[in-house]
């Protein structure tokens, strides 16, 4: 429901009230039978033995009541306030409802009388906002213990405990502060926005490894979702557009935007001061995007074994001292389980990222392109790592495997192929950290608008020929499949975005 009203020619009020409700359900069924009786008949009845049957069901609900009030005084002073109450079935009954709000202020300075003598300023608006938002991005039943059914013997049904519940789990909350400046200068030949943001997140939901008495494992694979941390994100963002040429026949606009931000974990519980999940470690004072892993030293030229710098326990059977370039000695090991892990001074966060767009028109021709970029940051290229390990069962190698160690005396950074040592030679380490810097030609387009004289002859209001290309090329050092990673610092087994070329004509009558 929406209400807007203008009072006394200078007061403008807009009020919004709303309600939303979502019901999410997913289900699936699967089956496998073997022993085909007749060829080319794929119905279950044509197979003699049931190998497996399975099914799944999951559901969650969310509901929200929200409101928003916008007010401005003659377009000069602006106020915006919002409030919402949200509930989500992912949390315990007494913790699933929470209140969230925000307030924003704006001041259009160019409308003040003291700016009347500054004709080259078309827009100059200061704005700021602050509030509380919530995040429910977790599984559907994290607060409840989970059981896996179907563990039957010959005569009795059986179940096993699959996960422990987290009865105190609740919303993550974030308190965002935004301060910005919108400007337009020289008859809007130069315009854009500058901004600073600060996000204080609390009640972060982490998967916490459980102690052995809770069913935990030495590897830490048994976890429970808990609200245990606080984190700060802060940074700067800018978008600036310029119009170098503005005329009757020729127009040219250039837009550049850039964002830079930092991240720091500011609080962890005393009982769990650090969480290690290779290749990261979560602890106070560090970024959750900072890599924590083994230091890959190279390859032993005599044996072809992978070497890792720093050992937990020195052993002559798997450790050795190697003289370094500075005349000192480095302690290395061939046993990845005995290799020390530490921060490697690399993060998945870029120094800066953004895009560059260009639009040029001359008479009836239009040309444009968009380039996105990221400068700095690293990614753990797990896809590349999988392509550099032993390719059993029909697996695939990366062409870099041709540079592997093959005989004593070979100098290379790729260890020998050895089925019995693949876990050691391909262990998680900074060997697979790759620069995430990239430049991408996202879009290029060319169009021609038919002149009015021709349009009148065919009784058309407009006609336009066009050709465009998307995802033309990625410039990157990445070696895995999909070269466009993300700030999580991990990769996935997915192909590059498809290169698409479109051409056509658009006519309106």
What are these model-derived regions, one by one?
Residues 2, 110, 345, 349-351:
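Active-site loop/lid in soluble adenylation, ligation, and acyl-transfer enzymes
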Residues 2-288, 428-509:
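Extracellular/periplasmic, surface-exposed regions of secreted and cell-surface proteins
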Residues 226, 232, 245-348, 388:
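Conserved small-residue
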């Amino acid at each position: 429901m929406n209400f807007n009203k203008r009072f006394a020619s200078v007061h403008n009020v807009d009020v919004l009230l709303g309600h939303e409700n979502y019901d999410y359900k997913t289900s699936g069924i699967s089956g496998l039978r073997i022993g085909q009786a007749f060829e080319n008949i794929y119905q279950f009845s044509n197979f003699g033995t049931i190998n497996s049957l399975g099914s799944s069901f999951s559901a969650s609900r969310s509901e929200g009541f929200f409101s928003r009030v916008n007010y401005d005084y003659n377009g000069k002073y602006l106020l915006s306030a919002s409030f919402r109450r949200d509930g989500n079935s992912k949390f315990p009954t007494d913790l699933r409802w929470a209140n969230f709000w925000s307030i924003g202020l704006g001041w259009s300075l160019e409308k003040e009388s003291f700016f009347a003598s500054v004709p080259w300023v078309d827009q100059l608006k200061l704005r700021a906002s602050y509030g509380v938002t919530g995040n429910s991005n977790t599984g559907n039943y994290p607060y409840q213990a989970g059981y896996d059914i179907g563990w039957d013997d010959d005569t009795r049904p059986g179940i096993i405990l699959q996960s422990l519940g987290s009865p105190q789990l609740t919303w993550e909350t974030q308190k965002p502060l935004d301060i910005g400046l919108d400007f337009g200068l020289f008859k809007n030949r130069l315009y854009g926005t500058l901004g600073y943001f600060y996000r204080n997140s609390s009640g972060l939901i982490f998967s916490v490894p459980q102690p052995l008495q809770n069913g935990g494992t030495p590897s830490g694979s048994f976890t429970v979702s808990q609200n245990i941390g606080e984190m700060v994100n802060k940074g700067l963002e800018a978008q600036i557009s310029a119009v170098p040429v503005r005329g009757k026949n020729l127009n040219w606009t250039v837009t550049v935007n850039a964002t830079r931000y930092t991240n720091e974990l500011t609080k962890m519980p005393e009982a769990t001061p650090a969480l290690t999940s290779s290749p990261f470690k979560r602890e106070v004072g560090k970024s959750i995007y900072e890599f924590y892993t083994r230091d890959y030293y190279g390859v032993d030229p005599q044996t072809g074994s992978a070497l890792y710098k720093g050992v937990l326990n020195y052993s002559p059977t798997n450790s050795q001292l190697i003289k370094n370039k500075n005349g000192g000695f480095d302690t290395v090991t061939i046993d990845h389980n005995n290799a020390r892990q530490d921060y490697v001074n690399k993060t998945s966060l870029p120094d800066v990222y953004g895009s560059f767009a260009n639009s040029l028109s001359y008479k009836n021709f239009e040309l444009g392109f968009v380039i996105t970029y990221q400068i700095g940051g690293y990614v753990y290229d797990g896809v590349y790592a999988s392509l550099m390990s032993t390719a059993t069962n029909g697996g695939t190698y990366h062409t870099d495997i041709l540079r592997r160690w093959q005989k004593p005396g070979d100098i290379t950074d790729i260890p020998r192929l050895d089925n019995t040592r693949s876990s050691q030679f391909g262990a998680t380490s900074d060997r697979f950290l790759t620069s995430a810097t990239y430049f991408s030609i996202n879009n290029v387009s060319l169009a021609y608008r038919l002149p009015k004289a021709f349009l009148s002859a065919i009784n058309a209001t407009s006609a336009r020929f066009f050709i465009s290309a998307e995802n033309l090329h990625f410039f990157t050092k990445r070696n895995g499949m999909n070269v466009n990673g993300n700030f999580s610092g991990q990769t996935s087994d997915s192909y590059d975005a498809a290169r698409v070329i479109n051409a056509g004509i658009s006519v309106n009558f």
